[in-house]
Regions:
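Hydrophobic alpha-helical transmembrane bundles that constitute the permease/transmembrane domains
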Residues: 20-28, 67-74, 126-129, 133-145, ...
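Transmembrane helix-loop-helix hairpins at lipid-water interfaces of multipass membrane proteins
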Residues: 6, 10-75, 79, 152-158, ...
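Short intracellular "coupling" helices and adjacent cytoplasmic loop segments at the cytosolic face
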Residues: 44, 85, 93-117, 121-123, ...
Length: 578
């Protein structure tokens, strides 16, 4: 954390100095009060004269010290929060940048809910940690040490009594922190769980309602929430027990001071003002220790949060970047050389010994049963994952040798799930090509068969999209996603089952418009419908992670039983084999 703190020492150091000023003013107050009592109040005669001038002068001095201390405290608070907010801002930006570099498996390992909690709640805890450390640590240390020092200067016996009380107070605090310490990291983990459940349920609310699972999900959330509340209550009980115990110890010390002070005042070895000052110093020390307890609670939470945030910052991207930039071309060739692949941590191979060559400008369709590896295959081209064996080449260069940004600039993907952002329709389409002119944006929408419903909207391309595209139908979301891919100036265009929500006529019109608009672009289409793939230059049939057959529609009807079965199930009754 030091690398973040040192950048804002120009806030932290003034904050510390102002806190020294505030605590110094607090420690001067009991001494002035002693003089007011001993040299002012006790010397007043029956007419009220005698020490009145001294009382007035010292009283004004105390008011001045209070005002000066308050000003120092305010400035300390301001500079401490400037330091903590800026440090938190830097950490948050670094975390987000690192998350943006994570591979898909790394994202899966952390989990969306956990990442959100770490970048929001955990960094807030770190900000509180920094602010409280700058404010609380200096104040507490000076109050405790200063109170004991001033007590010894005031009266050695009083100082010894206070010094003897300190281990008891500190021991009580240590026991509570020992009990509460392990619970604080658990709070963060349970908060992760609540966030994960909440995100899943909000995102899947339509499925939950359709399956009538509201009660089940309510119970699941309730269990996670009850676990969090249970841990919070244990922490509260521990600290609730500590406060009365420490207050009782303080009052015992005060009573002992009064008894000892009374004896010493009677013997003439001390003064009533000194007894009052001793009680004030005792109260200041106890307040310092109580503040230390709250400070350690904040520090423990902050340390646990920093450990979780460091897990993000210390995680190196799994996909090492290279420096090959490639060249600009309308189409790009793709080659799979003996490629095998399994999702990290899944323990099984999804693709086995894939050999496939796709020429620039060629349209290739990929078909197969659910789970045969179609999405995995096309995900290797933009290097969303690394192959387990073999190599994937784009323009004759292994994708691992490409700079990732340059490679993904060459590939446009319309994914299975249409991800839309809470922005206008036009901004969503231009997401992959920021700054694209309006006529290009409209042309892409026309190609994707989306211009009709967009133009019919009240604000056209300026219509805001609800979160997750909730205001649009499935087919509309898919067409906006396709328009986004079409607009991007890429050499390879991947449609990963991205027309599944479209009717056959709209889909046919879309592919006809796409062929006319991007004749030189390499197109890879993952689909389930024969009508979608039959006009492709080449159709790849996957079966259990292997290429079962590859050829044109007519060739596969003659040579591939799997393809013929798919054809018969979908279109066999509509037209004869060709």
């Amino acid at each position: 954390m030091w690398k973040y703190v040192r950048k804002y020492l120009y806030f932290a150091i003034p904050a510390a100095l102002f806190m020294v000023g505030e605590v110094s003013m607090d420690l001067l107050q009991p001494g002035l009060m002693r003089r007011i009592v001993d040299e002012g109040v006790l010397r007043l005669d029956a007419a009220g004269a005698g020490g009145l001038d001294l009382i007035f002068t010292l009283g004004l001095t105390m008011v001045g010290l209070v005002l000066f201390g308050g000003m120092c405290g305010s400035l300390n608070n301001m500079f401490a929060h400037l330091a903590s907010q800026n440090i938190g801002n830097e950490i948050r930006k670094d975390c987000f940048r690192r998350i943006m570099c994570f591979s898909f498996p790394q994202m899966d390992r952390f989990g969306t809910g956990s990442l959100v909690t770490r970048v929001t709640n955990d960094i807030t805890q770190i900000q509180n940690f920094v602010a409280q450390f700058i404010r609380g640590m200096i104040r507490t240390t000076m109050l405790v040490a200063g109170s004991i020092f001033c007590m010894f200067r005031l009266n050695r016996q009083f100082g010894l009594m206070l010094l003897c009380a300190f281990p008891l107070l500190a021991g009580c605090m240590a026991v509570c922190l020992y009990k509460a310490g392990p619970l604080l990291p658990r709070l963060q983990e349970q908060l992760d769980e609540i966030n994960s459940v909440m995100q899943e349920d909000v995102a899947g609310i339509r499925v939950i309602k359709a399956c009538v699972r509201e009660t089940y999900e309510t119970i699941r959330f309730g269990k996670a929430n009850d676990a969090l509340v249970g841990t919070q209550l244990w922490v509260l009980v521990i600290f609730a027990f500590m406060n009365p115990v420490m207050n009782a110890l303080m009052y015992i010390v005060v009573v002992l001071l009064l008894l000892s002070g009374s004896v010493q005042v009677g013997a003439g070895t001390t003064t009533p003002g000194a007894v009052m000052a001793a009680i004030t110093y005792t109260t200041q020390m106890l307040n310092g220790i109580l503040n230390l307890v709250m400070l350690f609670q904040t520090l423990t939470k902050g340390a646990a949060s920093w450990k979780r945030v460091r897990e993000i910052l210390d995680t190196q991207p799994e996909l090492a970047d290279s420096d090959f930039e490639g060249k600009t071309a309308a189409g790009a060739g793709v080659e799979f050389r003996d490629v095998s692949f399994g999702f990290p941590g899944a323990g099984q191979t999804v693709l086995r010994h894939i050999d496939l060559t796709i020429r620039p400008g060629e349209t290739v369709a990929v078909m197969g049963a659910t789970g045969c590896g179609k999405t995995a295959l096309v995900s290797l081209i933009p290097r969303f994952y690394d192959v387990t064996e073999g190599a994937v080449l784009v323009d004759g260069v292994d994708v691992r040798a490409w700079r990732q940004r340059a490679l993904r600039d060459r590939v446009a993907v319309a994914a299975q799930k249409s991800e839309l952002f809470s922005r206008t329709i036009g901004e969503n389409i231009a997401w992959g090509a920021p700054g694209a002119p309006e006529d290009a944006l409209r042309t892409a929408a026309v190609t994707a068969q989306a211009d009709g419903f967009i133009s019919a909207a009240p604000e056209g391309y300026g219509t805001m999209v609800a979160e997750g595209g909730a205001s649009l139908s499935g087919g509309q979301k898919q067409r906006i996603s396709i328009a986004r891919a079409v607009l991007k100036p890429a050499g390879i265009l991947i449609f990963d089952d991205s027309t599944s929500a479209l009717d056959l006529k709209t889909e046919a019109d879309l592919y006809a418009a796409l062929k006319a608009a991007k004749p030189e672009t390499t197109k890879i289409i993952v689909a389930q419908r024969i009508a979608t793939v039959r006009r492709a230059d080449k159709i790849v049939v996957l079966e259990r992670g292997r290429i079962a057959a590859c050829g044109s529609h007519e060739e596969l009807l003659r040579t591939c039983e799997t393809y013929r079965e798919i054809y018969d199930s979908q279109m066999g009754e509509e037209e004869p084999h060709e």
